[in-house]
Regions:
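N-terminal anchoring/stem segment of glycosyltransferases
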Residues: 1-93, 100-104
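Short, solvent-exposed loop/turn segments at secondary-structure junctions
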Residues: 10-13, 67-71, 115-117, 141-143, ...
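Mixed-charge, low-complexity intrinsically disordered segments
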Residues: 153-168
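Extracellular structured ligand-interaction cores
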Residues: 58, 110-112, 178-183
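Short, surface-exposed beta-edge/turn micro-motifs
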Residues: 2-3, 132, 180-182
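GT-A fold catalytic core of metal-dependent nucleotide-sugar glycosyltransferases
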Residues: 86-155, 185
């Protein structure tokens, strides 16, 4: 069985982390700069921990960065959706890559750049039966049901209600789960 782990690092400007639509007082450029700086400072270590993990469990690892493939994806995305931030484009790009890798690999594991597999972490592919579906963590417990509360555009609550609106607009039932896509495991048949 062919398996791969992949991650993405694109150094997007701090101002693009939240865009102009977030109303949360916590979504500041200063906060985003802390993240950007930490990624730069720990860049080598964040890649190494993933390559070590992949080697230990005997699977391939691929790191995607700001290259021509990403630039082409970003350009097309901005043409069609100019209101989308760089942060959001990366999130769509990781799903695009998940689909692309499923054409070559039987099972695929995506790890956000800040995910750190520990030395004692078990083999993800042996722990999770990906023949049963896509492996993600739901965050329904993080939904705030007080509509007066101000939410970040990236908060689980905003994602929940935005998804409800899209489902209703499409004529579907509005029930949905809030998913953390920082770690995604899937088999090619489910992608």
């Amino acid at each position: 069985m062919k398996r791969i782990i992949y991650s993405i690092y694109v150094d997007i400007p701090a101002a693009e982390h939240y865009g102009t639509t977030s109303k949360s007082k916590h979504d500041t450029t200063e906060k985003a700069e802390i993240t950007v700086d930490a990624f730069k400072e720990h860049y080598d270590r964040l890649i190494k921990c993933k390559t070590v993990y992949a080697d230990r469990i005997g699977v391939s690892f691929k790191m995607y960065e700001y290259d021509n493939q990403y630039k082409e994806f970003e350009t097309k995305f901005k043409e069609n959706y100019p209101e989308v931030t760089g942060y959001e484009i990366i999130n769509f790009y990781k799903l695009h890559l998940l689909n692309e890798l499923s054409q070559t690999y039987d099972e695929v594991l995506y790890l956000d750049f800040d995910v750190i597999p520990m030395n004692h972490s078990p083999n993800f592919f042996e722990e999770w039966d990906l023949s049963k579906g896509i492996c993600v963590v739901e965050q329904n417990d993080k939904i705030v049901h007080h509509v007066e509360a101000s939410q970040s555009i990236r908060s689980p609550t905003a994602k929940y209600y935005n998804c409800q609106a899209m489902l209703l607009d499409g004529g579907y039932h509005p029930n949905n789960d809030v998913i953390n896509t920082g770690i995604i495991g899937a088999s090619a048949e489910h992608i």
